[in-house]
Amino acid sequence: MDAIYEVHGLTKRYGRTAALNGVDFAVTPGKLVGLLGPNGSGKTTLMKISAGLLQPTAGSVIIDKVPVGVFTKAVTSYLPDRMALPTEFTADDAVSLYADFFTDFDKVKANAMLADLHIGGRDKIGSMSKGTQEKMQLCLTMSRAARLYLLDEPLGGVDPAARDYILSTILHNYSEDAALMLSTHLIGDIEKVLDEVILLQDGKVLRQAAVDELREETGESVDAYLREVYKC
């Protein structure tokens, strides 16, 4: 099967510091991939370049056979690692904005997910907790019929009780002809839903592997394996 998301020799430098250094990988449709690594390993930089928000120093990102640009923004649904909407917006304002910007946005689905999470349409973003803001942004992101979903730390600010709902939302709201990549530090919570992992360190790919293959090879969970790989 042809890859839907390809990264070739991707490098991003800030002065003498390389946030990414020759990153290569490919992801096929139907895969849910964990992008894993310690702080400063390049996860957010990779996602921002893939979402068209940063320019690389070298290399390329191909999404649905097209280099990152105007077209790929239309087929990529990106969840940033922090609130990207004005704090004076209400949840209804946010839904309307997404409906205006993205032709693949399902307003009915978004409102249903927000209601499930007890987020009212008139609730202002500025009055929401960090966890509620993240849940709202996830609902918006997953209400698009995208080809590629990029979720940067979707579980970072939510309480443990909400994580199962969020994982269920992720699993049930992307199709088999799409791919989804999420970055997280909470591998123990999401390992059960991942198909593959990509391990980053110091801006380089240490490894890309199927989760089942990694478990069989090491005889331990991915969480335990990562603790060994990234131990100080």
Where on the chain are the PLM-derived regions?
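ABC ATPase "signature
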Residues: Q208-A209
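The feature captures the beta-strand-to-loop junction immediately N-terminal to the Walker
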Residues: L36-P38
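ABC-family P-loop ATPase nucleotide-binding domains
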Residues: R82-Q137
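Conserved ABC transporter NBD signature motif
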Residues: A58-T72
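Helix-to-loop junction immediately C-terminal to a conserved catalytic motif
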Residues: A51
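Catalytic Walker B motif of ABC-type/P-loop ATPase nucleotide-binding domains
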Residues: Y149-E153
